[in-house]
Amino acid sequence: LGALSNIPFFYLWIVKLWTIFAKMEIKKQGKMLEAGTLLPLMEAFYTIQGEGYHKGSAAYFIRVGGCDVGCHWCDVKESWNPNSHPPTTVDEIIKTAHKYSDTIVVTGGEPLMWNMEPLTEGLKSMGMKTHIETSGAYPLSGHWDWFCLSPKKNKLPTAEAFDRADELKMIIHNRDDFSFAEQQAQKVAPNCKLYLQPEWSKREKMMPLIVDYVMENTQWIVSLQTHKYLNIP
């Protein structure tokens, strides 16, 4: 009977120890996420780039979870909550990426919510080219061979992001977006590639306007989401 009476006490200690270890693991993960050695990985896949300057080229995409920019027309809203995606070590991400391509595109979500230094340093140490797709709303981190900036009205890019941009990709959802695009174009370097891309759900309405605009303003280039037409990721 004495041994049996100790069972509840034993289980209480097990629960208490489990709680302590769980809290320690959460704290450890938090520090690793902050350091960038762990990232909330939504998905990763090898495909053909569908948009902008590198469309038609093969690349391995790393989609990082987490975004608070909040575009109402976002086609990957499931990426917004970083807690919905498994924390994955940068070493594991790099090891898998190396099997597929020497061109890596980091996208989101908003990847610059996280420290990109460990990821890009690891990728580049293995000879891979690093591209990023970002709103530019967060401080820059990482080493990038190509920087695609896509500003959003509700959370504008930093000055550093405008200075770094190799490509400016403006999403056109309505007529007002043309003037917003021109405002953003004034902030990038003269050699930055300028793209106008219709928001997918408005493409039939906005594409004729974009074509006319580009024909009158030839510094701009039409960008299509060709991967959606090809039915690939």
Tell where the protein language model's regions lie, with residue ranges:
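Hydrophobic alpha-helical membrane-insertion segments
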Residues: 1-4
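Conserved AdoMet/S-adenosylmethionine-binding subsite of the radical SAM
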Residues: 112-233
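Conserved Radical SAM active-site core
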Residues: 35-46, 58-61, 65-144
